[in-house]
């Protein structure tokens, strides 16, 4: 029997980032890419990320979280989704902290208030091989990449950061001047990024505030992307455009991002919103290959 059939699904969002959570701990099975796509195509269940809770693999962790994008591809990190998972595990109020595992590593989550959570998103990986890039780049704070005519590029020299997944951040003066819906998919699939990349446009409002718009790998334009917000802060701080803490404003809302100097950890804090919960209709998976 399909372990997803009639399984409880919790629909939430993190500042507009649409999240669906399914708890498969104890089920002895996971989710496939085709199954994730089938859920994403179901009316009322469309998501940016599907967070699948599986049995923990390490002592002290509450769950291993496998993350799917709407196209069925997997992602190693989703900050907004991780905050939503933390809410589901901490909502009874018995404790204020929970430790999760993902493909990117362990993530410590903490309740700040009823609907606000912090997540330690890990340490940024900044070497070309860690992003990864298809060629060496001695300075990943500004790599050789452009979009547009060679003699007059529209965008050029992004910073690249891996925050569990690859990010390229272009700093611009006016985000609205660029058609990210057209630019994003081209740059996402640029040969420089063998695993594709999330593409962001960032504007420095002040040393304490960044405006951000994101084309998310495997999703498209999104109202919010937590790992992109973390990557933007790291990129801005490396260029001396901000300090190590700033508010990142996305179309869906704001996140507080802190790149802690003591241990190089990036901490993201922001709100979550519960929408509804439902049971997954077995008919959803009738045509989904294993």
Swiss-Prot record:
Binding, substrate? 17, 49, 69, 79-80, 165, 198, 216-217, 226-227
GO molecular function terms listed in the Swiss-Prot or TrEMBL record = diaminopimelate epimerase activity
A Gene Ontology biological process in which this protein takes part is: lysine biosynthetic process via diaminopimelate
Q: Which UniProt keywords apply?
A: Amino-acid biosynthesis, Cytoplasm, Isomerase, Lysine biosynthesis
In this protein, the active site sits at 78 (proton donor), 225 (proton acceptor)
Query: EC number(s) in its UniProt entry?
Result: 5.1.1.7
Q: What is its main location?
A: cytoplasm
- Please state the pathway this protein functions in, per its UniProt record: Amino-acid biosynthesis; L-lysine biosynthesis via DAP pathway; DL-2,6-diaminopimelate from LL-2,6-diaminopimelate: step 1/1
Q: Name one Pfam family in it.
A: DAP_epimerase
Q: State the oligomer form and interacting partners.
A: Homodimer.
Q: What is this protein called?
A: Diaminopimelate epimerase
Q: Which gene encodes it?
A: dapF
